[in-house]
């Protein structure tokens, strides 16, 4: 993703290893010499028309980023889902993705449920890698969206769950994806809220661990060099801290705050254990 600029009196030449290299180079020129800020749209920046811009001759090398995958998730996306900003429903999302690129980001969760199907191709076309919400492993369609009349039980409908995962892999296998693995209940809750058979941490962790291994293997079968992540969020963090989860060694662990900036597990109803969400337990 690094780039090199060569500036002479006649021209500017950009060298880059991939598409994002050129995007970052153009954004650097845009901000440094035209004054366009990363959040220009969100801050209502007033643009200044320039008749002349002087860019010094010479060579500029960008620095390598210290963090390989850098991005964000658009939480509470319903707040912009029906906003057009006077242009179109897609436009605010395009501005979200542009701001991320201008900040040096390269990875995004482009919405959830129906939104993820709509905006993932746009984010990808704009140069971003895609990953998935923790309630939608592999970016698969929610079970109750696909099968609204069935009980969303993995034990009862294993083949249907795995069919949704297979479809998601096939749909995205040619894109740049960081594959999120895991298992939560429908509606973004612990899966055992609707299945009393899983009444201990050991039983819950065993099922989630087995599912993650299955998802991992399904992706690896089609994409040998795939990159994976999982979210240590809520009940998943608790199970991990208790030693009840077995996660493949090369899966990136995403440590989540509680939604209020504290690195502890998020409260769910009256359950608020405040388990540390700092790597190493600090």
Residue ranges, per PLM feature:
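Contiguous, structured surface segment used for ligand recognition
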Residues: 1-64
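Structural recognition of the beta-strand scaffold that forms the well-ordered cores
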Residues: 12-14, 70-74, 107-109, 130-132, ...
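The substrate-binding groove and active-site-proximal loops of carbohydrate-active enzymes
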Residues: 13-16, 75-90, 103-111, 144-162, ...
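Short helix/loop capping segments that flank catalytic or ligand/cofactor-binding pockets
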Residues: 22-25, 81-83, 140-141, 191, ...
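An acidic-aromatic substrate-binding cleft motif
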Residues: 37-107
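Gly/Pro-rich turn-and-neighbor structural signature
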Residues: 47-49, 53-55, 117-120, 124-125, ...
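Catalytic domains of carbohydrate-active enzymes, especially glycoside hydrolases
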Residues: 88-118, 122-125, 129-131, 174
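Structured mid-domain segments that build the active-site/substrate or prosthetic-cofactor binding neighborhood
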Residues: 101, 106-111, 134, 257-259, ...
């Amino acid at each position: 993703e690094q780039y090199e600029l060569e500036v002479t009196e006649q021209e500017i030449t950009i060298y880059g290893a991939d598409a994002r290299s050129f995007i970052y180079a153009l954004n650097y020129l845009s901000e440094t010499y035209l004054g366009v800020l990363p959040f220009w749209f969100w801050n209502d920046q007033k643009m200044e028309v320039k008749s002349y811009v002087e860019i010094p001759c010479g060579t500029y090398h960008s620095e390598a980023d210290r963090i390989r995958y850098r991005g964000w998730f658009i939480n509470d996306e319903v707040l912009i889902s029906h906003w057009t900003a006077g242009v179109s429903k897609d436009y605010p999302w395009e501005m979200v993705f542009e701001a991320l690129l201008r900040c040096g980001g390269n990875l995004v969760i482009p919405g959830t449920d129906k939104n993820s199907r709509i905006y993932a191709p746009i984010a990808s076309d704009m140069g971003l890698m895609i990953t998935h919400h923790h309630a939608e492993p592999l970016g698969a369609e929610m079970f109750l969206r696909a099968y609204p009349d069935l009980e969303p039980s993995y034990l009862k409908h294993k083949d249907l769950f795995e069919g949704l995962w297979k479809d998601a892999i096939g749909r995205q296998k040619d894109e740049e994806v960081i594959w999120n693995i895991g298992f939560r209940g429908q509606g973004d809750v612990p899966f055992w809220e609707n299945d009393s058979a899983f009444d201990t941490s050991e039983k819950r962790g065993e099922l989630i661990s087995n599912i993650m291994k299955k998802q991992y293997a399904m992706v690896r079968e089609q994409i040998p060099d795939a990159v994976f992540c999982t979210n240590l969020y809520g009940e998943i963090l608790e199970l991990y801290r208790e030693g009840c989860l077995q996660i493949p060694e090369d899966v990136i662990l995403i440590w989540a705050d509680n939604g209020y900036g504290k690195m502890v597990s998020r409260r769910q109803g009256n359950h608020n254990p405040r388990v540390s969400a700092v790597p190493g337990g600090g």
